[in-house]
């Protein structure tokens, strides 16, 4: 009999030694055995691009949806306070089919471009740098969070701000009943440890102004070698 395959390395910090946090009939969720504490779906059980697109096409988030606008307000208010005087230049990364956040920030005097790998795939926007980048309900979809967070880091100017919105992962004893894990496109789950690990690696400061909002601010100048 062949020996069991080793646990998949953490897709954020690359640590080995993960253990199964929860398992259902269709999915297995691993808890990182290293320093970052990410929870992630088994790579073999992630949805493919077509399945992801089919799920995203079901979303009906747009500027005319008052409930969605209120939802985004949980990020908009602390972000505007952190940005200071307008205008600042920003990018909404993963804006979806109905960009909304950029309009809310534009109303406060900021210039925000919309990028989405499916619905607005203008890769020229990824060659620029910004005062701030937003990613609302995005990072939980990352199959390769190390690569994607490096991309987000590279979009920011010195002193820039990354504003994230994602539900923070339930405690292990409550994970089995946590609804957020059930979306088939949600494959990476964060709480304060993974977010703190990312911030430390960037030399950034981390603030958590709401239960599902995180702000990471880069230093004003790159750290010396």
Residue ranges and their predicted role:
Residues 1-132, 136, 147-150, 165, ...:
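Conserved N-terminal segment of class I S-adenosyl-L-methionine
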Residues 84, 143, 157:
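Short conserved AdoMet
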Residues 111, 161, 205:
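Residue-level detector of anion-binding/catalytic polar loops
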Residues 137, 141:
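A short His-aromatic
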Residues 149-158:
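A short glycine-rich, Lys/Arg-flanked "PGG" loop and its adjoining helix->strand segment in the class I
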Residues 165-188, 193-194:
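Short, glycine-/aromatic-enriched active-site segment of Class I SAM-dependent methyltransferases
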């Amino acid at each position: 009999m062949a020996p069991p395959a080793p646990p998949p390395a953490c897709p954020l910090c690359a640590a080995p030694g993960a253990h199964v946090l929860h398992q259902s009939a269709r999915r297995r969720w691993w808890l990182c055995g290293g320093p970052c504490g990410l929870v992630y779906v088994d790579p073999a059980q992630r949805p493919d691009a077509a399945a992801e697109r089919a799920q995203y096409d079901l979303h009906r988030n747009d500027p005319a949806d008052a409930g969605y606008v209120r939802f985004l307000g949980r990020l908009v208010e602390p972000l505007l306070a952190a940005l200071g005087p307008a205008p600042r230049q920003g990018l909404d990364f993963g804006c979806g089919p109905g960009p909304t956040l950029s309009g809310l920030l534009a109303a406060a005097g900021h210039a925000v471009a919309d990028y989405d790998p499916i619905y607005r795939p203008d890769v020229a926007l990824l060659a620029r740098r910004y005062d701030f980048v937003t990613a609302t309900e995005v990072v939980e979809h990352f199959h390769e969070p190390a690569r994607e967070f490096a991309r987000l880091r590279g979009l920011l100017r010195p002193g820039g701000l990354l504003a994230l919105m994602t539900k923070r992962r339930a405690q292990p004893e409550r994970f089995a009943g946590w609804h957020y894990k059930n979306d088939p496109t949600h494959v990476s789950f964060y709480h304060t440890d993974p977010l703190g690990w990312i911030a430390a690696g960037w030399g950034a400061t981390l603030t958590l102004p709401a239960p599902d909002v995180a702000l990471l601010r880069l230093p004003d100048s790159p750290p010396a070698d």
